[in-house]
Amino acid sequence: MASNRILYVCQEVAPYVPDTEGALLCRKLSQAMQERGNEIRTFMPRYGCINERRHQLHEVIRLSGMNLIIDDNDHQLIIKVASIPSARVQIYFIDNDDYFARKAILRDADESYFEDNDERAIFFARGVLETVKKLRWTPTVVHCHDWFSGIVPIYLKKGLRRRPDLQKRSRSSFRSTATVS
């Protein structure tokens, strides 16, 4: 059986953020698919609550340094990487001080959503796709987990017109643990 190239675009991955259903799922799914011989790349935002020293994150200079324009402003894209030792799974982190330096993930101390969560999600999605492009790596399957990654399939569909290698091969799926009220 030929292995797939699977891209996981995750809002959270355990153990880097508190154990939520989504964070645990992304970790276990990435690990299980890699153990079955698939080639995977897993991405998540580098939130300010992630201890870079404890988790041994380091910047990947050759992938960092590009600027992404969000709402008419330039924002530097920084790529960091770490491995989950017990799983031998590598995680790529999309980082930017304007969007991800704060200690909370999606809500402030009053439990209100950050006003710029939409911009943060756009930056994350574009950062993932630009990094995959820089890696010269073409996924056959794209898994998007939670709403922070929800725009990735739209970007993929729009970008497929310019990337014939992805047109016939790439399939995407979306999973959300959010409740709608």
What is the predicted function of each stretch?
Residues 1-181:
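Catalytic cores of nucleotide-sugar-dependent glycosyltransferases that transfer UDP/GDP/TDP-activated
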